[in-house]
């Protein structure tokens, strides 16, 4: 108070005022501070000071022809004196007002196109709903978030090339537009921005906003998708939050969300197949998300999630060096350790072989709902500081940290046997066994851990074995903090390797990720995910397997037909028939297979009994290992819609219905495609079955005599030509092959050439 009074007295004296307002600043340090460098040191002050002047703006001399010297009120708009040090004119802020009211108008058609991201933001805010403001402590943690809704995911180099091509098409310099998205965007933007009068630099800047993901490391409590981040300043303060529902979604958030769902589904499915890595790659390459190839999205999208990172590692892309355990991302912040195998005994006297980390280390742990700092030594937890949204989330983090510490009291807290298995029915590794065990029930773990008295530290409280907060006592080494732990900010990516069981390791051999770490959470994707791989047919249930299997046969009928007649075993072993087996009652699989294979063999042996529809219908049943039995079936059962449904061996049924008139097949009422050729008994089969060893040369040639019947063909000598009658009275010219090779390709070309010859 004294100081303020003193200052007031000083200010009341005119001399003080004069010194402060009139005296020049001549202290070198101060002058240096405010004049060195191009960076403005006090922009707000500079702006106020400039705008108080009469002519704070400079403009090109041409402005004198475009704007009158005075406005309607007689106020001067520009001064005849030149700006010191340049040949520009000094202009009043009033000139801007005059220009806005009376200046030339231009077409506004391009504005919404160029400033698309702004217009869309306004729409989202207009349709968004703001709820009540609540006052409460905010646990914010810094996360890397996307601050730019509505962007494509091009790299800055790719975007640069697109921008140059769109905005400065005539500039020199090599531009390589390779990716599909680059080409599509360039074409679209060139059309949109034809005759655009907006300054090219502005267009380039706005295009960059549309094409490139911009991320910042910001303190966030709550939603992290870009439509929430754009209103961060409205939804959360230091001690308050405001509920908000965005008024629209943007594609980039949808891509991120759908990518995570697709990756999780693919990793889960690959983990149970015979060769997980090969299956995973096959699925990533054949999946599309919102019409874009998943592998293209993986290359461009920086989303860090366990399943997504496993897919990236499989493709040979770099990923973050942090590792995952129990759904938390661990990042070592200091210390180091060496690994050693050690055998330990659980409370149930079961022996576990664990890889012990020897040495002092500190980690940050970041999960979706809780974060922590962990300090540990060899098999000992020294300190754990946790913060989380609620009791449950905090407990999850404590369990993971206790298991990770590998302490003896944790291993001794195991009751019962550890025999958890993964989706492929393989035993989990010991650390994940322990984790699963305590995630199911951690009572004994918390009870046996031990408690200790605590000091009163600001912002920290203790936590008891029943997970209630306490100010006097706490679980040994564990404290709960009001402050969150920031996510690891670095965007550094490292080279990793992946084994066939999808375990991802860094170059020192540390396991960063494994399928056990992939979340089981199911969600509904925002964008359509199209899994073309047969391995993913099961994801939508038995009906989808049935429809997809038949669709696949029809789509690939040309090749299937040839394999059916020449190399059936190879056909039966195709992975596309695997999912179908789960629909056939276990007891009947072998019998059905034996029956169908015998039936097919008869068709091959007896000319003219080839029946396309029947082969398509029964083919999936022949894929199971056959049992030799004399059993005959008039119908085969498949388990769909919760019960057994019958497929008739001869004739239509609700499951498999072929319409001769439209040549279309419906499976369970869903369209499964059209048969491209006439499935009349005898024709197609005879062509491919009989013309083996013959080359079709083209249409009938009268010089080679009358048309022979198919049976007379066998009398031809090698290299001899003849006309032959096939199918429904069509005649083609053939030559008997000189050597008995490439019989398979014969049938393929035969079918194609017969068509060409007939047409």
Curated annotation (Swiss-Prot):
The record marks 627 as: Avian adaptation. It comes from the Viruses. Disulfide bonds: none annotated. GO terms for molecular function: RNA binding; RNA-directed RNA polymerase activity. Its main location: virion. The keyword Protein transport does not apply. InterPro entries: Flu_PB2_2nd (IPR049110), Flu_PB2_6th (IPR049114), Flu_PB2_C (IPR049115), Flu_PB2_CAP-bd (IPR048298), Flu_PB2_middle (IPR049111), Flu_PB2_N (IPR049106), INV_PB2 (IPR001591), PB2_helical (IPR049113). Keywords: Cap snatching, Eukaryotic host gene expression shutoff by virus, Eukaryotic host transcription shutoff by virus, Host gene expression shutoff by virus, Host nucleus, Host-virus interaction, Inhibition of host RNA polymerase II by virus, mRNA capping, mRNA processing, Viral transcription, Virion. The keyword Cell cycle does not apply. It is found in: Virion; Host nucleus. One of its GO terms (cellular component) is virion component. Pfam families: Flu_PB2_1st, Flu_PB2_2nd, Flu_PB2_3rd, Flu_PB2_4th, Flu_PB2_5th, Flu_PB2_6th, Flu_PB2_7th. Plays an essential role in transcription initiation and cap-stealing mechanism, in which cellular capped pre-mRNAs are used to generate primers for viral transcription. Recognizes and binds the 7-methylguanosine-containing cap of the target pre-RNA which is subsequently cleaved after 10-13 nucleotides by the viral protein PA. Plays a role in the initiation of the viral genome replication and modulates the activity of the ribonucleoprotein (RNP) complex. This is Polymerase basic protein 2.
